[in-house]
């Protein structure tokens, strides 16, 4: 298999693997901890703490009954758009852009599965900084944030590569 085909296959399989890791970690948390319980690992700095997020990032719209439907619709639309650009970036051999889009796609799909299946997103990764608790998140959130930062960096520092895809 030549390098381009190998990279294309890898970039297209990456979201599947990341979604699997996301869903398996959520399954572990749900079956290990009761809601709003967890376990600290590093001197009460890092812990797993099971929560159910009915909103979006940082629980935005969590208190709105219609919020889950709006978020699900927006997430589905964005996932489709990201996937279209992912396929296009692979076709033009822009693997750095494709990698960032794969991360974004995995993040969107991982949380979308939860929203459709459970009507909330399982969050569990928690960091405490003294009295401040950073908003609790999951593997899909990590993928989405890394993909977003990577895409912004590409657009700022390698604009010609991004232009080939858009």
Residue spans for each PLM region:
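Alpha-helical transmembrane bundles and membrane-interface segments of multipass inner-membrane proteins
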Residues: 1-166
